[in-house]
Amino acid sequence: MLSFAVLLGATVGCSSNPLAGAPRTIEPAAAAVSPPASQSPAGAVRPLPAHAAAAVFDAGTRRLAVLAPGSAPAAPGSLTVFGDAQAPPRVVDLPGPANALTDDGQGTAYLAARGGYFAVDLSTGHTAQVSVTDAAQTEFTAVARRADGRLVLGSADGAVYTLASPKPGAVSAASVASRNKVFARVDCLATQGDTTVVLDRGQTSVTTIDADGHVQQALRAGRGATTMAADALGRVLVADTRGGQLLVYGVDPLILRQAYPVPQAPYGLAGSRALAWVSQTVSNIVIGYDLSTGIPVEKVRYPTVQQPNSLAFDEASDTLYVVSGSGAGVQVIDHAAGRR
């Protein structure tokens, strides 16, 4: 891992200068195709026939937002917003296809799209389409929000854009503060403070970008990393789906702190103060691990809906949401961490 970090650090800088030639890649890993659920899912299941692609829980409005693609690659996607358990969810039709989802914790969701992003008010459903300067033909595939409010977007052609405005929901066009094109593809972004972590599935790597937009360290991430999530304690969780591991990183500097076997094609991730949550897509199981001792310790496990690709967690109520990627609904597990 060290040799990879040194090599990448020596060949990239803080501007948009690309590497000489395309980065070497492997076949990206993916979630397993889950069998039908063999056990009744824990908790309650709310219907959602769409094949969900991502989910976030917004603490400010106490709403769960679930992104689903359209019926065809070019068809507009939708955002389903779950609030009151006694009321039907709100379905927000998006202006176009969307590829990734994040939120600001204060009631606004941001979705990566072609040429820019969508900003959705989770309380009203109002949606704004924001274009990124000089990126009209760019397919944005990942999005995250920094602590200073700035959005970071990743693209299908391997670039990371840090936007200039600290209020991304209040602009109609977004200028770019920095751009780094050093990846094969940007599949996932996460942030800790104003540091951005980039996951490239084809390179099965994680890379940090600092607050000024400078590329910092890079490390290999197992044999086939697929998903990534940040937690409230400064850690970044990565699912090595092909290698069957949970990887836990610190970001300042980037360092692999824990690697623990998780079989059955781990994929869905959610961080929390108490436990790190990982879903197993082969077996339709979600597991909560305590990371506090330095070696992950399994504390709880629950049977899930089929294809548990997306997880979200509500710290205030200790509620875990497991969102099916096959149309089997949204599973709600109250008091998920239990007594510890």
Residues of each region from the PLM?
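Sec-dependent N-terminal signal peptides
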Residues: M1-V6
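Predominantly soluble domains enriched in secretory-pathway, periplasmic, or organellar proteins
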Residues: L8-A10, C14-R340
